């Protein structure tokens, strides 16, 4: 005991070096490389689950103990020491650590993020790149554990880390629409077919002598769907939507078939005439007759029924034709006369009221 007290360095010069460990007592060679000693102790401190544990012997190095100062100023750290077999094995184990162990927890410590050491101890991995075990302090970031703090993770890893709602779902819209389109191709006509049918329908309708309003009324009589003259006009002009054109095409096609099949027999013609109002023949008035009517209009813009009858007999025209001509002439005069000016029919005072039906023509 006295000898040990008188020679405090006898422990360092002994043939064996003994230090405390969590698993028990381990002996080390006095000529063992301090770098290898630190790496072997670190490897023993890593359990099977991949979580490195803080070794109390390594922690004591950062407390400024005698071993810390001795190793920091040792000439072995200043000279170039080639890595041994244990160094290569340690680097290979750290480099080939499985990704699921590294991503096990966001608080898992990376070998590059261990506590600082006073000496720059480093090892070389299997790829030949230096791997600092103790000299890079810091904390790990989730998703960047295997790639350091500056290099982003691969694209596959970033995709897996996204929330399921944020991930792009597989595009099934095109497949669904393509399936529906293939299913409806047999029933839905193309735009070229609709254009060709509209052209043929207009030609056949004019040849048969029916107006667009007649067709709309006929569809209501045949199928219960009354269409206006505007709808038939927009169909012929291809101004309806594609969906409405497809709905109206079979109805008009049936009407054409019915009209073509009933052209020869009088009974069928009467049936079609009853379905819709047949177009009346346009009346053409000669220039001489029109001059007589103009002269009479300047004298009396609103003739009575007896005057219309006598005028129709003298001109050999129908009474309805004369009445409609006067009605249309008054409307024309009203359009041509600026507002506020006195119109010709206001000069003459007549007690006969104009028939309201003349304005419909």
Swiss-Prot record:
Query: According to the UniProt record, which residues make up the DNA-binding region?
Result: 278-337
At the highest ranks, the source species' classification is: Eukaryota, Metazoa, Chordata, Craniata, Vertebrata
Where does the protein principally reside? nucleus
Q: Which residues carry this modification: Phosphoserine?
A: 265
Q: How does it assemble?
A: Interacts with HNRNPU.
- CDD domains of this UniProt entry? homeodomain
Q: Which domain of life is it from?
A: Eukaryota
Q: Which organism is it from?
A: Rattus norvegicus (Rat)
Name-wise, this protein is: POU domain, class 3, transcription factor 4
């Amino acid at each position: 005991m006295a000898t040990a007290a008188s020679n405090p360095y006898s422990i360092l010069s002994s043939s064996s070096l003994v230090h405390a460990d969590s698993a028990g007592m381990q002996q080390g060679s006095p000529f063992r490389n301090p770098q290898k000693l630190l790496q072997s102790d670190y490897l023993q401190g890593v359990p099977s689950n991949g979580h490195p544990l803080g070794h109390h012997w390594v922690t004591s190095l950062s407390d400024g103990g005698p071993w810390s100062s001795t190793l920091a100023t040792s000439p072995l750290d200043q000279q170039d020491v080639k890595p041994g077999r244990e160094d290569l094995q340690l680097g290979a184990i750290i480099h080939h650590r499985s990704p699921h162990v590294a991503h096990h927890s966001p608080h898992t410590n990376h070998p590059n993020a261990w506590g600082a050491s006073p000496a720059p101890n480093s090892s070389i991995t299997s790829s030949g790149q230096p791997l600092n075990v103790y000299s890079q302090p810091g904390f790990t970031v989730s998703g960047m554990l295997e790639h350091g703090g500056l290099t982003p993770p691969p694209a596959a890893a970033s995709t897996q880390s996204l929330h399921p709602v944020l991930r792009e779902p597989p595009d099934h819209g095109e497949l669904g629409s393509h399936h529906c389109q293939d299913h409806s191709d047999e029933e839905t006509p193309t735009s070229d077919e609709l254009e060709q049918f509209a052209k043929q329908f207009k030609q056949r309708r004019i040849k048969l002598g029916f107006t667009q309003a007649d067709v709309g009324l006929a569809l209501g009589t045949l199928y219960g769907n009354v269409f206006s003259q505007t709808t038939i006009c927009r169909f012929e002009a291809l101004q309806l939507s594609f969906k409405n054109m497809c709905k109206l095409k079979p109805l008009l096609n049936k009407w054409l078939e019915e009209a073509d099949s009933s052209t020869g027999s009088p009974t069928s013609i009467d049936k079609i005439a009853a379905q819709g109002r047949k177009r009346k023949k346009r009346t053409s008035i000669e220039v001489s007759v029109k001059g007589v009517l103009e002269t009479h209009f300047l004298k009396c813009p609103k003739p009575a029924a007896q005057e219309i009858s006598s005028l129709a007999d003298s001109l050999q025209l129908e009474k309805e034709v004369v009445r409609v001509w006067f009605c249309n002439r008054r409307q024309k005069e009203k359009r041509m006369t600026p507002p506020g000016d006195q119109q010709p029919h206001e000069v003459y005072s007549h007690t006969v009221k104009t028939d309201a039906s003349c304005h419909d023509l």
